[in-house]
Every structure is written in structure tokens, then in C-alpha cells.
UniProtKB/Swiss-Prot annotation:
Residues holding Mg(2+): D100, N223
Ranges for region Linker: 226-246
Oligomeric form and interacting partners: Homotrimer.
Pathway named in the protein's UniProt entry: Nucleotide-sugar biosynthesis; UDP-N-acetyl-alpha-D-glucosamine biosynthesis; N-acetyl-alpha-D-glucosamine 1-phosphate from alpha-D-glucosamine 6-phosphate (route II): step 2/2; Nucleotide-sugar biosynthesis; UDP-N-acetyl-alpha-D-glucosamine biosynthesis; UDP-N-acetyl-alpha-D-glucosamine from N-acetyl-alpha-D-glucosamine 1-phosphate: step 1/1; Bacterial outer membrane biogenesis; LPS lipid A biosynthesis
GO molecular function: glucosamine-1-phosphate N-acetyltransferase activity; magnesium ion binding; UDP-N-acetylglucosamine diphosphorylase activity
EC number(s) from the headed UniProt entry: 2.7.7.23, 2.3.1.157
Similarity annotation: In the N-terminal section; belongs to the N-acetylglucosamine-1-phosphate uridyltransferase family.
Residue span of region N-acetyltransferase: 247-453
Protein name: Bifunctional protein GlmU
Amino acid sequence: MNIVILAAGTGKRMRSALPKVLHPLAGRPLLAHVIDTARTLKPTHLVVVIGHGAEAVRKAVAAPDVQFAVQEQQLGTGHAVQQALPLLDPSAPTLVLYGDVPLTRAGTLQALTDRAGQGGYGVLTVTLADPSGYGRIVRDAHGKVARIVEQKDATPEQLAIAEINTGIIVAPTERLGDWLAALKNDNAQGEFYLTDAVEMAIEAGLEVVTTQPDHEWETLGVNSKQQLAELERIHQRNVADALLVAGVTLADPARLDVRGTLECGRDVSIDVNCVFEGRVTLADNVTVGPNCVIRNANIGAGTRVDAFTHIEGAEVGANVVLGPYARLRPGASLHDESHVGNFVEVKNAVLGHGSKANHLTYIGDADIGARVNIGAGTITCNYDGANKFRTIIEDDVFVGSDTQLVAPVRVKRGATIAAGTTVWKDVEADALVLNDKTQTSRTGYVRPTKKKS
């Protein structure tokens, strides 16, 4: 089977310089969702027709299995499909999809192609309470499809029809090419309509068959920011419903955003206003507090992620406590039972089993062993303005508050760093390190006072 995805439109109502099909839904371009669905049908040829913003669209979705055809002038859907014909297998049927209709399910498309068979013409239709704006399916006295009439060309009687054309069709490729070549643009829009090929198919003796999706939202398209927002909420509701069915506890399904894939184990609980991006895995008994952002991360069993924690590109072990207001940046690896508390940032660093950094700390480019205590206000000074250096802290080290570790530096097993110390040389095992400081007290000191005006 061939699949053609039309993605050449300008999207004027979006009021944006970004091509319409590249506007994000759940964090990915609209067109990417359509391509993903198309791939599940295993087409032999997958062609995207591009036009407005062609190079940006090509760059955004380029892949070895995707071919591109260019529609230099946007002269209608029939003209767009014509541009793809040279790239198709003429002996296989062609399914036509739209780059701005992202929520159609693969099962719906499979049902349409199965109904049409190898040589039939199939149209996906929907019956709407309010069909305004859509082309109507006109049937004959026997209930068979006779033609499709666009809204602007319809008579008052035809406008009363509730069954509408979604634009998604499947047809025999070789014959479709002949029909498209015979299209005329004598209509209100002055365009070559793909829908006009229906009458030609009927005249050629083909019965045009139809199927309908299980849900109206499967065929909703995006022509404005309002419609984009509506589809975003529909998609997120569907994701939330699937998580609930799988046993995940959601404090409020309407306040969850998944912009990628979220895999959850048993007894996972997610509070409100959480965002998951990329590929995220939450193992059994993970609890995520409110207002967290987790991107491309794996969170181990029993871990608690408290409010306002941001995690990106991190590996988190089991029974870890994170936050509130913690930040894990790419390359962070937290072993089991470690703690990263409020206003602690970890980047490209390992925190060993049972180690704790509970307050106001920056840990960057560091390898920290097991059972290490990192006091409040500790900074690993990893950057000299040109190069990054690593800090190594071995097992059972105690680092006091307000410590600066100037990398490259190693603190060996069991050492103690006194509060307020700057460490710029390696520390031996079990040693106490402190910077000698003299404390001076003055009796009778009087604070300066402001002059009264």
C-alpha cells in the first residue's frame, strides 16, 4: 500500500510564520503524529506532499522511509496528490491522509482499507450534528455514494445532509492517476478537488464504499490556534484515560500533560500540573508531587518526587527522595536511597547509595560515593571558564556546609570537610580538612544609623 500525506497548506488562520503542520501537539509536530500512524500500516511507499515552508517541513520529519513531493502552487487536494503519483507503486492502492489531522487511529484506517480492498474506492465519513464547513456525502436512492459536494458548492438541500467527507480516501493508484488528470477547477474555490474523483470512479463502474471512525475527534483538523488547543486537550484526555485504565492514580486527569511516552508500573501516583516529555519511565510505587517536569528520565521503584522538581536526562534509583524544588540535569545518576533536597542542582554527576544533598547545593561533573553527606551551600567548582573538571568524593565522606570543592580534586574515603572550607587539594582518607580562620570580636560596637531627613 502507498500512503500520501498532504502537508503543503499555508495555514493562514494560524497567524504564524511556522508551517501549520509543524505546530506542536503533545510536544511533537502535527505531521509527526500522522506519519507515526501511517507507519503502523506498513506502507511500501510513504510520501509527504510539501509546499509552504517546504524545507522546514522536510527537515522536521526527514527519515529513511519518508519521501517528499513538492507542490509549488497550492491548487487543491487533487493537484497535491498528483505531485506524489510518480513516487508511488501503481499496482498498490493509495491511502490519502492529512498532515493537520493528527488523531486518526490506525485501526480506523485499517478498517477503511480492508473495506475498499485492493481495487476499491473507500471514503472515511462522519455524521455530525453540525456539519457546517464540510463537504457533504450525497447518496442515491439506493443509499450508495453518488458524489461529494463541497460546502461552498452545495445546494440548500445538500447542506442539510449530516454525513460529511473527512477527506481521507483510499483508491487504486493507477486509476486514481487517470481521474486526477481529468479534474477541472470550475468551482467556487478555483481548485482541483480530490473529492471530484469520486464521481469519476462511480462513472467507471466502481462502488464507492464508506466507513466511519469510532470517535468524531479522530477526524478533527487544525486550522486555528483554538482548534489546536482543543485537539491538545482531547489527546491529553485520551492519554490520561489510558493511564487510569492501567492503574495509575491521577489527582486530576485534566491537569496532566504527556508530551511523549510515559510508562508506569503498579501503584504510581501523579499529582496535578505535571508535565512528562520525551520517554519517561516511572517504576512501581513512584509518587510524583504537583507541578513537576520530567523529561527523558527513568525513575526507580518507591521514589518520591516532591513538588516543583525538574528532571531531565537523569537516571534515578529506587527509594530516592527528590525535592521539593530540586533540579536534575542531563547525566545525573542517583543511586538507591539517595536524597536530593530543595534548591539542589545535579548535573552530569553520580550520587551514590544513601548519599544526601538536602539543601542549597550545586553538584556538577562529580562522582560521589555511598553514604556521603553534602552540607547546605556546597558547590563543586567545575569550570575554569574554558574547561570542565571532575570532583571525586569517595564513600562515607562528610562535607560541611558552605564548602567549595575546586576541581579537579579527590576527597578520599571517610574524610571530613569542616564548614566553610575551600578544598583545592586532594584530601586523604579519614582526614579532617578545614581552612584556618581567625574570628575577631569587638566589644562596644555601635551599628551605623541612617540620618533622619
